[in-house]
């Protein structure tokens, strides 16, 4: 808690944040856009809505949510998204990157998902002069316990940071 509290500072500006479906959010010229989309993987059922149901339930105010009582983690019923297929995910990222081409972009995405790291960099590079990838080692804590000894729970979470210009952090 102390380290989190120490990270809070006053930049002297009036700041606003929005949350919601990045495809639908209406905001003019955001400085920074953070996107943590559902991950598509043909090898896993780690579908965002089904796995992160508590956060999703809160975001939906528990409206229209159907819980699968027979699952250990009480997953949600699957809801289709643009990220439900490989092509759909690539197209959705392209649309998001284009929509926010004038903003700093930070995208969180898993190494075991598709599009791949190289494909994500290529997509973001269509709209950003600079794309950096920050890999963070991560271990799934639940859901793949049958494979705990095979390292299938170990992945990298990538933070893709895209921006234009040389000194993006000092523009104001």
What is the predicted role of each segment?
Residues 54-96:
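Glycine-rich S-adenosyl-L-methionine
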Residues 14, 30, 102-104, 130:
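A general structural motif
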Residues 43, 49-62, 82, 127-129, ...:
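Accessory, usually C-terminal, subdomains that scaffold auxiliary metal cofactors
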Residues 1-48, 61-75, 79:
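SAM-dependent nucleic-acid methyltransferase catalytic core
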Residues 78-128, 135:
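Conserved Class I SAM-dependent methyltransferase catalytic core
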Residues 117-121, 128-171:
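Class I S-adenosyl-L-methionine
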Residues 23-24, 39-40, 112-114, 139, ...:
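Short, solvent-exposed loop/turn segments at secondary-structure junctions
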Residues 27-30, 43-51, 116-121, 144-146:
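A short acidic (Asp/Glu
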């Amino acid at each position: 808690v102390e380290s989190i509290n120490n990270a809070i500072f006053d930049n002297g500006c009036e700041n606003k944040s929005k949350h919601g479906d990045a495809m639908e959010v209406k905001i003019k010229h955001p400085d920074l856009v953070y996107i943590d989309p559902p991950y598509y993987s043909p090898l896993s059922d780690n579908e965002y809505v089904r796995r992160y149901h508590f956060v999703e339930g809160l975001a939906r105010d528990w409206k229209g949510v159907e819980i699968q009582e027979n699952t250990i983690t009480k997953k949600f019923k699957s809801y289709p998204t643009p990220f439900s297929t490989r092509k759909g995910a690539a197209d959705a990222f392209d649309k998001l990157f284009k929509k926010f081409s004038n903003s700093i972009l930070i995208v969180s995405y898993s190494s075991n998902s598709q599009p791949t790291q190289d494909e994500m960099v290529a997509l973001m590079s269509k709209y950003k002069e600079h794309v950096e990838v920050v890999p963070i080692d991560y271990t799934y804590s639940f859901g793949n316990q049958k494979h705990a000894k095979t390292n299938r729970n170990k992945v990298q979470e990538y933070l893709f940071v895209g921006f234009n210009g040389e000194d993006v952090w000092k523009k104001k």
